[in-house]
Amino acid sequence: MIHRERMRDHFVTLVRIDSPSRQERALAMHLAEELHHLGAEVSFDEADRLVGGTVGNLVARIRGTRAGAAPFLLCAHMDTVGADVGIRPRVEGDVVSSDGTTILGADDKSGIAIICEVLRVLREEAIPHGELEIVFTICEEIGLLGARHLDVAQLHARTGLILDSSNPGHLITRAPAANRLQFTVRGLEAHAGVSPEKGINAIRIASEAVAAMRLGRLDDETTANIGTIEGGTAINIVPNTVTVHGETRSHDEAKLKIQTEHMVRCFEEAAARHLLSLDGVIHRGQVHCQVHRDYDRLFIPEGARIVQLVREAARALGREIALWQTGGGSDANILCAKGLEVANLGTGQREVHTVREHLVLSDMVRSAELVLETLRLQAA
């Protein structure tokens, strides 16, 4: 059975170990030792060299105890969002939170704690299981970089679970594809008080472009956002350069393409409206647009083996599991694009990426119970 207090205490220990993106080494070494004591063979890949980090993805393997059972993958990410360190967790009844000055790190250390607790129970109770592969990735929060550089050809498992969402009653089988956009706008510098008519204001071009865009929730499948605007040097200078970053996501590739092209067109049209003649030379606003595919969409069909397994496990526990569509990406997007069949199960984390982030312990237990039952059935 799942030990609630042990799993809670382990989670609290994990969140006290700082692990911002690219700085996961201390946590990784701690987990490597724990997994070794649980009978795992532990190694690290070289993803850190590709992303400028301090440690690679942790890949662990536990031999199966049931002959013929298929290998199974369990995955979570080690990094926490932003630069928060010195997290001070507080336990109050069924909830773990931070002290309100930082994130908590339940995203995704709750997933790590669940995986470790399940492994302990399998070992303590001698529950038969197939070969287990555990992957704790790096740099998920800054573009799913760890998963992106993971060599899945080295894994034996083709099916598995990622523990990195909220509700343990939801199995995420659909998530959007996402494009990241960068717009570099160039105008013409001038003195803002003496000769503003000799300048082309790059901030104004960017403002007009953003104002013309369709942003927010566009429909039930598509979203778009402008996240940062950087530019200008002083209030008395007509700014000549602005950089704007945005994104768009959709479950429909055609809609994603249309929205991406719309955002690019808004900038191109805004830049084209700004031109002036100066000493016989025509100056125009310019924009350079870069579009980068962040990740492909996640779509796992209802008849997939992982869906059947988790549903059967839920029924065995007297529960229902809902197949869920989310607007966020996860390592599951990357791993499924690489040919694995990996769904995302909730852990009890709430209000992630904010100082209000917290973990509901009863949900964490429910998630661990479901993972344990899934592994039991996988080996049946």
Residue locations for each model-derived region?
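A non-catalytic alpha/beta surface segment that caps or lines the substrate-entry region
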Residues: 20-67
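Glycine/charged-rich beta-loop-alpha catalytic/anionic-binding loops adjacent to active sites
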Residues: 90-103, 186-190, 317-318, 349-353
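Active-site metal-coordination/substrate-binding segment of hydrolases
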Residues: 53-57, 61, 68-136, 157, ...
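Metal-dependent amide/peptide-bond hydrolase catalytic core
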Residues: 202-380
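Acidic, glycine-rich active-site loops and adjacent beta-strand->loop/helix elements
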Residues: 48-50, 78-80, 135-143, 165-167, ...
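N-terminal capping segment at the start of a domain
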Residues: 1-25, 293, 350-354
